[in-house]
Each structure stands twice: as structure tokens, then as C-alpha cells.
Design a protein with these regions (language model features):
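Glycosyltransferase donor-sugar binding loop
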Residues: 71-74, 238-255
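Donor nucleotide-sugar binding/catalytic pocket of nucleotide-sugar-dependent glycosyltransferases
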Residues: 153-196
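Conserved donor-binding/catalytic core segment of Leloir-type glycosyltransferases
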Residues: 160, 199-219, 224-228, 242
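Nucleotide-activated donor-binding/catalytic signature segment of Leloir-type glycosyltransferases, i.e.
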Residues: 254-278
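Aromatic "clamp/platform" in nucleotide-sugar-dependent glycosyltransferases that forms part
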Residues: 295
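Conserved acidic donor-binding segment of nucleotide-sugar-dependent glycosyltransferases
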Residues: 330-337, 346-351
Length: 454
């Protein structure tokens, strides 16, 4: 457990998204169009929450009126938000509305029906197959969310992904005008380290393997446990696995993970749950390696946090992970536990190699911090403002009810095609019933005794 210091304060400052004091653009006059944001939930300490607040700081510094409208918010952030229904009162065809898309929220549906020029920001939706047999409701919500995304294809003046990977999904979904609004995370929440935490008890000379993220199926925590088991039994018995992140809502998956630990009889696996920012910083400080086996990420901020805290990263090369790491750290392409354990041993037993990895991560982090988030955002806002005034889409009172019925029909088509093949092709249900009644009568006539027919 070698304690590491984070990057210099000056570097950290340049990486804060939406730095206050961004230059105000000239030549717009006293009245500037409002640029509001709408999303389902503003969470405390999560990547989307940081991005939303950063966007607001940039917009306000540039002279725009900018509010955050939500359905729900963490109690610690409620004072920074307004109820999504208030958006109706401030809506205008000349305004820009930045819509952070999420699955099936009422806030999203209100935003859809307003005349504001919409800029959709897509943070990705996990493919539903990851949650089969673990969270049936989430399977349905993710399936519907990915389908609902298509309803906004012609509603937006721009559709932005917060990574190149997410933008590629927008292009594949048929959005005609797309771009990348890069995530430039703030690391200010890691500036202070708690004293007297459980993390300090792990700073004892053992090798600490760390993962930070929710305990959910697409993060493949089960693969992390299998890899750690191979490393501990074959390479280093004085090692422990620290799993930091909430498992709320995924009790069944969490129980499966605990059962896996018991089945493998692997000791020193610690499920640490959700922790404070100060405790999180302490866990990064005692970590010797950040290990990631996730198979679906839209960006993955904890990878950048590990870079910032100078913890060498070994991650599975899937979805947005390679582009997020941008040449820093080490990627692996096979999930063989013995293979990954050997790579872990090669890294941790070679101090010079660790320094080379940390240098590659520092360079990647510098490239990330050098991205002009403020300028990129304001250019996209100007592009949206230059679009013709918005027109409220013609939405019937039962539009979303009909959309949900179509979703259900599409789900049947994909997963129970035989049910659709059983429906009449050219006739209505009434015609089909009439035809069936006639056929029944004919069969009865043919099957009756000769005397009755005569």
C-alpha cells in the first residue's frame, strides 16, 4: 500500500469542467438567449452531475441565463435546480434547451413537446442484456430507452455524445447532426483525504487491487473476483481486492458476487459500498493497481480519477475504455484469469514499468485537460442558436401512450415473432372472426348426417 500524491494543483485546476471566469463573448447585445438544461435526476458526485453543473458555469460566465430543470435531485443539490414543470413557463422558440437524455423520464417527455431548439446530450444507455435474470425491470427500461432515443432523431438541432463512442451510437441511430462534447472531469472532490478511515488500515504492506464503480453486471465484478483469485493463489498471497461502489438496487447480483467469493474460497475481498469523496481519495492513495473488467462504458470517469491519483491502471479493452484511456495505462483483450494475473504480476513486480505506466497516464490526462471544453460547448450553442426558431412538435394527447404500445409490439416482434406471424395479414380482426365463423358453419354442415343436409 504505497501512498501516492495526486497531480499538482495547477494541473487539477485546468481539468475542472466549466471553469468559472470563462471569457464572455462580445457582440451579442444586452439580451442573450437563455440556454437551459433538463434531465431526469441530478445526482451528487456522479459524472453526469459534474458535467451538468460545469455546463451551467460556462453558460452563465458567457452571459446566458441558464437554469437546471429536473424531475428529482439529491437533497444536497436541490437548491441548484428547478422542477421540470417550470420549464413550460420559460420555454421560448428562441431558447436553446440542452436535454440530457435518459430512459423514460417525464422531464424528457415535457422537453420533447416544447418549442425550444433542443441539443440532446447522450450519456449512453447500457444494453439491456446485461441485466437479464438480475433486474427484469431495468431490462425493460433500457430496451425502451434505446428505442425511445429514436423519437428524438428529428426533434434535435444537434445531438452530442460525451465521448466519441457515444457519438458513434448516435450516428448509428440515424441522427443527422452530431458532435462530441468531451468529458473533462473535475477532480476537486479528491482534493481532501479523510483521516482515520478504513482505508488507512489497508496501508500495511499488502498489495491493494482497487476498483471504483457501481456493483452492477456490465462492470463485470464477477470477472474481477475471478482474476483476483488467480492472482492471489498463483502470484501473490499478500493481496486484497477493494471494491468501492454502491450495490443499491442490485441485491440479487450482489448476492451472486458473495456466492462466487464463497465458492472460490478466496479471502480478502472487501465490498466497501458507497463512500464519501474524502474516503474515496484515501482508497486511491493506498491502491497499488486499479483493475477494470467492465464490458460497457460510455466514458468511465474512475479511470481518469485513478490517472489523477497516480495509480497504474489495467483495464479490459471494451467499448469506450480504450478511447478514454487515450494511450495511458495498460489494456488487456482476453478475460483469461491466469493471463490477466500474469500481467498484474509483471506490472507490480517492476517499479520501472510502473513509472512508465504512470508517465503514460500523466500524458493522457494532460491531453484531456488541454481539450477546450468551454469553447467547444459555446460553439455548439452558437450553432444551435443560428438554427431557425423552434416549432413545438405536433404531439397528440396520447403520443407517448401510442409510442409505448409501439415499443411493446416491437418487443414482441423481436422476442416472440411467432405471435406476430399468427395474426391475419390482410384482414381486420372482425373480418378474421367472421371468416372463422363461416368456416365453422361450413364444417358443421359437412359433418352433419345426410338426412339433415337433405
Amino acid at each position: 500500500g504505497r501512498v501516492r500524491k495526486g497531480r499538482p494543483a495547477a494541473d487539477a485546476a485546468t481539468s475542472v469542467v466549466g471553469v468559472a471566469g470563462a471569457p464572455v463573448r462580445q457582440g451579442r447585445g444586452a439580451e442573450m438567449a437563455a440556454v437551459h438544461q433538463v434531465l431526469a435526476t441530478l445526482g451528487y458526485g456522479d459524472a453526469i452531475g459534474h458535467e451538468v453543473l460545469g455546463i451551467q458555469r460556462v453558460l452563465r460566465a458567457a452571459g446566458h441565463d441558464s437554469e437546471i430543470f429536473v424531475q428529482t435531485a439529491d437533497p444536497r443539490l436541490e437548491h441548484l435546480t428547478r422542477d421540470y414543470r417550470d420549464l413550460i413557463d420559460v420555454s421560448s422558440p428562441d431558447n436553446v434547451l440542452i436535454h440530457h437524455f435518459s430512459i423514460g423520464s417525464r422531464a424528457s417527455r415535457v422537453a420533447y413537446a416544447l418549442p425550444d431548439k433542443m441539443v440532446l446530450v447522450y450519456h449512453n444507455i447500457t444494453p439491456p442484456e446485461f441485466f437479464v435474470d438480475v433486474h427484469p425491470l431495468l431490462v425493460q427500461l433500457c430496451f425502451m430507452g434505446r428505442r425511445e432515443l429514436g423519437a428524438y432523431r428529428d426533434r434535435c438541432v444537434l445531438a452530442l455524445g460525451d465521448s466519441a463512442f457515444n457519438t458513434e451510437e448516435l450516428v448509428a441511430a440515424g441522427f443527422p447532426r452530431t458532435g462530441v462534447l468531451p468529458v473533462v472531469p473535475s477532480f476537486s472532490h479528491l482534493a481532501n483525504t479523510a483521516v482515520g478511515t478504513i482505508a488507512e488500515s489497508f496501508d500495511d504492506g499488502w498489495t491493494n487491487i482497487l476498483f471504483v464503480g457501481r456493483m452492477i453486471p456490465n462492470k463485470k465484478i464477477d470477472d474481477l473476483i475471478r482474476i483476483f483469485h488467480a492472482y492471489k493463489t498463483q502470484c501473490n498471497p499478500r493481496a486484497r481486492l477493494l471494491l468501492v461502489g454502491s450495490y443499491g438496487g442490485f441485491d440479487l447480483y450482489f448476492a451472486m458476487l458473495q456466492q462466487l467469493v464463497a465458492t472460490l474460497k478466496v479471502p480478502d475481498v472487501f465490498f466497501l459500498g458507497h463512500v464519501s469523496n474524502e474516503e474515496l481519495s484515501a482508497f486511491y492513495d493506498v491502491a497499488d493497481l486499479f483493475l477494470c473488467a467492465s464490458e460497457h462504458e460510455g466514458f468511465c470517469v474512475p479511470l481518469m480519477e485513478a490517472f489523477h491519483k497516480r495509480v497504474p491502471v489495467l483495464a479490459y479493452a471494451a467499448t469506450a475504455v480504450p478511447s478514454t484511456m487515450d494511450g495511458g495505462g495498460v489494456l488487456y483483450e482476453t478475460k483469461s484469469p491466469t493471463h490477466v494475473a500474469a500481467v498484474m504480476e509483471a506490472i507490480l513486480d517492476d517499479a520501472d514499468l510502473v513509472e512508465q505506466i504512470l508517465a503514460s497516464q500523466d500524458a493522457a490526462l494532460d491531453r484531456l485537460a488541454a481539450q477546450d471544453f468551454d469553447g467547444t460547448l459555446l460553439r455548439f450553442v452558437d450553432e444551435a442558436l443560428a438554427a431557425p426558431p423552434g416549432i413545438a412538435p405536433k404531439v397528440s394527447f396520447d403520443f407517448w401512450d401510442q409510442f409505448e404500445l409501439q415499443e411493446q409490439l416491437e418487443e414482441v416482434r423481436q422476442y416472440r415473432p411467432s405471435a406476430l406471424r399468427a395474426l391475419p395479414v390482410r384482414s381486420t380482426f372482425a373480418d378474421a372472426a367472421s371468416t372463422e365463423a363461416s368456416a365453422t358453419a361450413d364444417r358443421s354442415a359437412h359433418e352433419s348426417p345426410r338426412g339433415a343436409r337433405e
